Amino acid sequence: MVSITLPDGGVRTFPRGTTGGQIASAIAKSLGKAALAVKIDGKQRDLALPVEQDCRLEILTRESPEALELIRHDAAHIMAEAVQALYPGTQVTIGPAIATGFYYDFARSEPFTPDDLVKIEAKMHEIVNADAPFTREVWKRDDAIEHFRSIGEKYKAQIIEDLPATETITIYRQGRWYDLCRGPHLPSTGKVGHAFKLMKVAGAYWRGDARNEMLQRIYGTAWRTEKELADHLHQIEEAEKRDHRKLGREMDLFHVQEEAVGSVFWHPKGWALYRTLENYIRTKLDAAGYVEVRTPQLYDSSLFKASGHWDMYGDNMFKIRESVAEDGTEKFLGVKPMNCPAHVQIFRQGLKSYRDLPLRMAEFGNCHRNEPSGALHGILRVRNFTQDDAHIFCTEDQVGQEAKEYFALQLGVYKDLGFDKIAVKLALRPDVRLGTDETWDKAEESLRVALRANDLEFEELPGEGAFYGPKVEFHLTDAIGRSWQCGTLQLDFQLPERLDASYIGQDGARHRPVMLHRAILGSLERFIGMMIEHYAGKFPLWLAPVQVVVATIVSEADAYAQTVAETLRRAGLRVEADVRNEKINLKVREHSLAKVPVMLVVGAREAEQGTVAVRRLGGKDQEVLALGDAVARLKDEARSPAGAETVSPAF
């Protein structure tokens, strides 16, 4: 007999070899029908596999968080079967579940077309309706390689050849079709349901290597219910309308081009937005006791070798060969991918005492990372970016209070910027790590206490911390429900040791400071791209690149319009005067497309009376105000949440 511990703590005994599916049915017939898979001691397994030893067991159903990954994994297999049924000779490679769906890479001489996707999707529905069971088989390694080569599936043969010799080779069948797969799978194709859709075809190199063959990747999405699918498709449609690249052009904020791949050309209006955000963060940091620094871009490789980045992060760095010695030894420089080693260099200048701690060092640091060209995306994923980076050097006893204060600062910033749905995750010690268990216990508990002190609910992620310390991640939900990982706080016990940072403690001896890596926005470029999509370009007045446009109805009001614009400018507002000889409806339409929050419409009457007609973006009504009243109201509305002293950059 085996003892099964259930999620509620109850213990049941079953004959050794009882399957997960049989256990589910024994608990309740309805559970047996709803079961999709099981988790045994935290690992997912097929329902049909026997349970051979005592364990903790959880029955996974369609409502389980893990269900979507299982559904999407099976949908990828069903799509591959459909493709090979419709287009014989197509070779299959890999097909995983991903964040919102699945994909499968195919080797085929003819390109897939939109019409092909319609046919493949229809065939997938047929396969689901057939409700063929998924069955698991274990094959001998050599037999599997020989078999796949014999049927022309060279990619599958390569995958098996590259697996460790100890790896069990498993094949899953669904009807007459089969594929190499570790599993687990649902009981049958019918359990996938019909809430799926094929989305697009893209190119992909075999194993992600540009030196290999180009394959065709078909992307799909799959969900538990038709409603979830419809909601997701609506979100995609809404995201296309909000695409920061499209709005960036319409609002004249920035552009990117091939001659500077992965870098942003900020236009005057976009740079005004950038500087407004930067100045806001700077004001918040000043109030929180940070000192701002500026560090170089280019360093001798010795610094990055000492910090560990040359070995651990070297492939993502831009390197410059500076010289070659007579013996052939090459000397390299590295463009910094992050700011932390440089901040340690500043900390090391001069003797530091425990009285100097905590030291909060901030920088709007310009960094470069050698991202693959295929991964670049507008300003959301670039090679050259600026981080609102800071490092807090403190004692171990100060970690909890510093984390608490940082979380409060971070949450305040997100609220000011319009984000109130925040998921917090605490990544805990990995198996391979530096430091003692006692140090990790203290660090992890300090972060827990700090999170609770800010009334933050958080999810713990065992094993997902960095090898040098635990990490807190902040995930923001935007206006259409997408999640973005932004801020982080990471404890680092390693870098101060590697780069020989120390302070004199109360005992007169040298000690290593704890280093807290933290960023609120992360990359400013990425955060601005995210905000453009979150607000659909309709920024609150204080952030808007152009806050006010003064538009004339008749040419007789041109001089007055310029006077109004100058008055607003002196009040600190970002303003344009539109005195073109065009109809007012055209001006309204164009400035609405540019997402200008406020238009002040002036004609002969307004010029004579010293008034303006205030028109809000998206509104149909106008409010006539005296110029002085309008300026006072708009100045107050445009006040930065960081305080009245924040400068409003002109463009």
UniProtKB/Swiss-Prot annotation:
Cofactor comment text: Binds 1 zinc ion per subunit.
Cofactor names from the entry are:
Zn(2+)
Might you give the EC number(s) for this enzyme?
6.1.1.3
Residues of the TGS domain: 1-61
Please list the GO biological process terms of this entry: threonyl-tRNA aminoacylation
SMART domains, alphabetized: tRNA_SAD
Record carries keyword Transmembrane = no
Q: What is its main location?
A: cytoplasm
Locations listed in the record: Cytoplasm
Give the span(s) annotated as Catalytic.
Answer: 243-540
Q: Which superkingdom?
A: Bacteria
Extract the GO molecular function terms from the UniProt entry: ATP binding; metal ion binding; threonine-tRNA ligase activity; tRNA binding
Q: Which Gene3D superfamilies match?
A: 3.10.20.30, 3.30.54.20, Anticodon-binding domain (3.40.50.800), Bira Bifunctional Protein, Domain 2 (3.30.930.10), Threonyl-trna Synthetase, Chain A, domain 2 (3.30.980.10)
GO CC, any one term: cytoplasm
Please list the reactions this protein catalyses. Answer: tRNA(Thr) + L-threonine + ATP = L-threonyl-tRNA(Thr) + AMP + diphosphate + H(+)
Binding-site residues, Zn(2+): C340, H391, H517
Q: Which InterPro entries match?
A: aa-tRNA-synt_IIb, aa-tRNA-synth_II, aa-tRNA-synth_II/BPL/LPL, Anticodon-bd, Anticodon-bd_dom_sf, Beta-grasp_dom_sf, TGS, TGS-like
* Membership in a protein family: Belongs to the class-II aminoacyl-tRNA synthetase family.
Quaternary structure, from the entry = Homodimer.
Per its UniProt record, what NCBIfam families does this chain match? Answer: thrS (TIGR00418)
* Its job: Catalyzes the attachment of threonine to tRNA(Thr) in a two-step reaction: L-threonine is first activated by ATP to form Thr-AMP and then transferred to the acceptor end of tRNA(Thr). Also edits incorrectly charged L-seryl-tRNA(Thr).
Task: Please identify the protein, giving its name as recorded.
Answer: Threonine--tRNA ligase
Q: Which organism is it from?
A: Rhodospirillum centenum (strain ATCC 51521 / SW)
Q: What is the lineage of its organism?
A: Bacteria, Pseudomonadati, Pseudomonadota, Alphaproteobacteria, Rhodospirillales
What is the gene called?
Answer: thrS
